[in-house]
Amino acid sequence: MNSASHPGRPVTTAAGLWFLVAATGLAIFASYIGISYGRAALGGPPGQSRWVAGDWLGNGLLSVHLVFALLLTAIGVLQLIPPLRRRVPALHRNLGRVFMVGAVLGTLSGFYLVWVKGTVGGFVMHAAISLNGLFILAFAWLAWREARARRFAEHRRWALRLFMAVNGVWFFRVGLMLWLMVWRAPVGFDPKTFTGPFVYALSFAQFLLPLLVLELYLRTRGRGRMLAVTLVLLSLATAGGIFGATMGMWLPRVV
């Protein structure tokens, strides 16, 4: 049977391609988090740890943030695998609870790390990160509410939005390294302070762009040749960014 008999098949196939690419990149990212910060927690080489002597609150929240970053990266991919949802629904429910609680705790600890402990990027970048966090909190609550009400179609939509928002930090790194691969130089930003028009734009695009593409997918019900082409192009761009991030950012820090 040809694709005309199944108008949604090209988009479904393209979406599946993007998911496979993203799942691979997220697995690499999760491995990086586990190895890099696990080594630091066990007393690895100086300079790898972001802990500050005597800052028990900051260090504790940093630990919470990193642990949930690792868990959310791994669990998020598992939650989107259809056979797992169908064959082991109890596991899907329990992992979903961990994911939503982790998203909330990771976001709240992130607010502290950005606004109290401090990080690079300046006010614009911090505001974008905080807006991303507010989206995460809202999507987590809405996904939980719909699941409790057994409105599973709506729950799935909010859970997908939550997945995109939670992975904003990953999208940022992939987008940044794709940009650097294209220009072969830090065009549009200062790499020392992480300020400048490009990183400001990317700070918002890291969650707004994935959410926009997801909304197009949900509202068109997976139909449309242009959407399929867009998803294939995004898959290629994502693969390029993953390669750049792996070779230029993650791998050098763990070997």
Residue ranges of each PLM-predicted region?
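Alpha-helical membrane insertion/targeting regions
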Residues: 2-255
